[in-house]
Regions:
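C-terminal helical cap(s) of enzyme catalytic domains, especially alpha/beta-barrels
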Residues: 113-120, 213-252
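Structural preference for beta-strand elements that scaffold enzyme active sites
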Residues: 5-9, 46, 74-78, 99-101, ...
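Catalytic cores of alpha/beta
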Residues: 77-78, 83-96, 186-223
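Conserved, mostly hydrophobic/aromatic
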Residues: 11, 39, 47, 79, ...
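Alpha-helix-loop-beta-strand connector modules within alpha/beta enzyme cores
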Residues: 57-78, 114-130, 181-201, 205-206, ...
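Glycine-rich, proline-tolerant flexible connector loops at the mouths of alpha/beta enzymes
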Residues: 46-64, 104, 170-181
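Glycine/small-residue-rich loop that forms an oxyanion/phosphate-binding "nest" at active or ligand-binding sites
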Residues: 53, 62-120
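Conserved anion-binding
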Residues: 12-14, 18, 98-171, 175-176
Length: 252
């Protein structure tokens, strides 16, 4: 049985870790390297750093930050945000990131998935998907932080990303993100059954039980969360204890 992974997510803006709902009303929650070290000590399996800076200056700061993270933590980490080309991905991987996460740019130009996978290998490529459920019940892809609907249906796009060389899918339900109301379990159960590659669940964790649920009933390979870890509402150790109690394999 593959070990289930717990992945804290750190949104970074102008070099600081921030947290808000739907990328708005952002609050500063600390230094990204210090926070990453804290989570590594707590037992995090991996980290995800998402650069939500809107400026080129912020992007440059992020590359320098990736070098600091690579020097400062001893667990794998993925970086994303603003990666629009192979050159962007190369810059961050060369700075020390273990994987890159691509989102809106992959929707706009799906060949980007293949370009990065062919250069570095699929294990370096995470395709992040921000999906939103429409009033008719269907799930569609959104871009630009969930603000723009596309005409791409979720399951078709996830399958295309897999075929183009994605090593993992990071799926966020924009309906649930930041609400702490739990993950949409039927959505993840369907997607994980549909794909060969690992699925990381994101968007909605409010307690350890929500994470346990998406990794068991939802079939996800990993769970990503931010608020509940940043604000100390639960710890990674508590989540892993709850998983172990359910007979789920976790890294100690």
């Amino acid at each position: 049985m593959l070990t289930k992974r717990i992945i804290p997510c750190l949104d970074v803006k102008e070099g600081r870790t921030v947290k808000g709902i739907h990328f708005e009303n952002l609050t500063d929650v600390g230094d990204p390297v210090t926070l990453g070290q804290h989570y590594a000590r707590e037992g995090a399996d991996e980290l995800v750093y998402l650069d939500i800076s809107a400026t080129q200056q912020g992007r440059n700061t992020f590359t320098q930050l990736v070098e600091r993270i690579a020097d400062g933590i001893n667990i794998p980490f993925t970086v994303g945000g603003g990666i629009a080309s192979l050159a962007d991905a190369s810059r961050l991987l060369d700075a020390g990131a273990d994987k890159v996460s691509i989102n809106s740019a992959a929707v706009a130009r799906p060949e980007l998935i293949e370009e990065i996978a062919q250069r570095y290998g699929s294990q370096f490529v995470v395709v992040a998907i921000d999906a939103k459920q429409r009033p008719d019940g269907e799930w569609y892809i959104t871009t630009h932080g969930g603000t723009r609907f596309t005409d791409r249906e979720l399951f078709a796009w996830a399958h295309e990303a897999q075929e183009r060389g994605a090593g993992e899918i990071l799926l966020t339900s924009m309906n649930h993100d930041g609400t702490r109301s739990g993950y949409p379990i039927p959505l993840f159960a369907r997607l994980t059954a549909d794909l060969r590659i690992p699925v990381i669940a994101s968007g909605g964790a409010g307690c350890a039980g929500h994470i346990v649920e998406v990794l068991t009933a939802g079939g996800a390979d990993a769970a990503l969360a931010a608020s509940i870890f940043h604000y100390g509402e639960t710890t990674i150790a508590e989540v892993k204890q709850a998983l172990a109690a359910r007979g789920v394999s976790v890294r100690a």
